[in-house]
Amino acid sequence: MAEKKKGKTITVEQIGSPIRRPKEQRATLVGLGLNKLHRRSTLEDTPSVRGMIAKVEHLVRVVDEA
């Protein structure tokens, strides 16, 4: 079995409510693993994740980049 390389991770926290936001922004939050205020999610630091964060930068904040 091949070993999985450990890559960089990024932790994001939801700071804004998805209420009265477009469906695309709500779906992006779900894609990031966020669904309630002040919840945190640790994800791989990839260009696709960075793009998702950029789409909802007013609703999330980056807590940690490791």
Swiss-Prot record:
Keywords: Ribonucleoprotein, Ribosomal protein. Signal peptide: none annotated. Disulfide bonds: none annotated. Part of the 50S ribosomal subunit. Belongs to the universal ribosomal protein uL30 family. It comes from the Bacteria. Coiled coil: none annotated. GO terms for biological process: translation. Gene3D superfamilies: Ribosomal protein L30, ferredoxin-like fold domain. SUPFAM superfamilies: Ribosomal protein L30p/L7e. This is Large ribosomal subunit protein uL30. GO terms for cellular component: cytosolic large ribosomal subunit. InterPro entries: Ribo_uL30_ferredoxin-like_sf, Ribosomal_uL30_bac-type, Ribosomal_uL30_ferredoxin-like. GO terms for molecular function: structural constituent of ribosome.
